């Protein structure tokens, strides 16, 4: 909404980098559309920090979406994997705000510490939210303003009903019906589109995978 380019980066399998200001790993970055650095970025001129950085302390961020009406930035993020020795699960949805620290690896999931941000939503066991999108169309009035997560490991779409920053309810959709869901988006026609990711070596693929699919309302009953 501010006409800037936002980029998310993982921690490059070295979790210490997420807290290091001189590394771009494990961060949200903010740039102008020509690649230059906005002068109002939070770490511009701060010793030991790269000026591109918007937020720090991320493990493996995935999708970004801005909430209609508030312009809050929502971010989906994958929690720790077994090889890191910190268990599984703890996937997150965060509200990402200027200059804040989202904790990895000091905190993750439901753990807390002073000065570090806890997630709006946490998922254990893991559902691997690969994308997120707000619905603002007119084909599904009941979905207006809802946040949708495409989940890989969970093989489903999660619908989150929100009131600003407050979570009202959640609903699992298409669970187990289409396999791993990679990307989800609202089309210009007002329908919801999503892509599957069953041929990435981690899913069971059908003969016609992978696919881009569309969700449409049920026709009215006669």
Where are these predicted regions, by residue range?
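Beta-propeller domain segments
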Residues: 2-4, 11-171, 179, 189, ...
């Amino acid at each position: 909404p501010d006409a800037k380019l936002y980029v998310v980066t993982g921690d490059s399998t070295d979790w210490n980098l997420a807290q290091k200001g001189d590394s771009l790993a494990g961060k949200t970055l903010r740039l102008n559309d020509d690649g230059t650095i906005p002068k109002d970025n939070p770490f511009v001129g701060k010793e030991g920090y790269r000026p591109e950085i918007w937020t720090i302390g991320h493990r493996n961020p995935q999708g970004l979406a801005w909430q209609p009406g508030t312009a809050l930035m929502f971010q989906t993020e994958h929690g720790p994997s077994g090889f890191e020795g910190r268990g599984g699960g703890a996937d997150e949805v965060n509200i990402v705000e200027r200059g804040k620290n989202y904790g990895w690896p000091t905190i993750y999931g439901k753990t807390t510490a002073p000065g570090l941000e806890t997630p709006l939503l946490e998922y254990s066991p893991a559902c691997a939210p690969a994308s997120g999108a707000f619905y603002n169309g007119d084909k599904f009035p009941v979905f207006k303003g809802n946040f949708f997560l495409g989940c890989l490991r969970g093989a489903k779409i999660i619908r989150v009903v929100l009131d600003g920053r407050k979570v009202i309810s959640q609903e699992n959709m298409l669970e187990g019906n289409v396999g791993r869901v990679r990307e989800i988006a609202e089309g210009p026609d007002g329908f919801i589109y999503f892509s599957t990711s069953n041929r990435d070596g981690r899913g069971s693929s059908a003969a016609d995978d992978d696919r881009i699919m569309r969700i449409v309302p049920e026709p009215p009953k006669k």
